[in-house]
Regions:
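Motif-centric detector for short Cys/His coordination patterns
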Residues: 1-75
Length: 75
């Protein structure tokens, strides 16, 4: 994913009103399920995600393959 698409997609999903959970799919197969908007901070193509339990995950646009929809729709 390119840097501009990454920044735009993350910000769009993070700031939806009302907030809806979304998934960030990494190129290595890891999936980050963002269920709270403040669990994710984004700046200049890099992001910090706080996974359940407060575990920090640092990643950038080069490691992301897709940012996708609403987790609730898949249950």
């Amino acid at each position: 994913m390119d840097r501009d698409t990454f920044d735009s997609a993350i910000r769009t999903f993070k700031h939806r009103t009302p907030f809806q959970p979304f998934t960030i799919a990494m190129v290595n197969g890891v999936r980050l399920e963002v269920d709270y908007p403040d669990a994710l901070a984004v700046r200049d193509g890099a992001a910090l995600y706080f996974a359940p339990g407060g575990i920090p995950v640092l990643f950038d646009y080069e490691g992301v393959s897709q940012v996708a929809g609403d987790l609730a729709e898949r249950h």
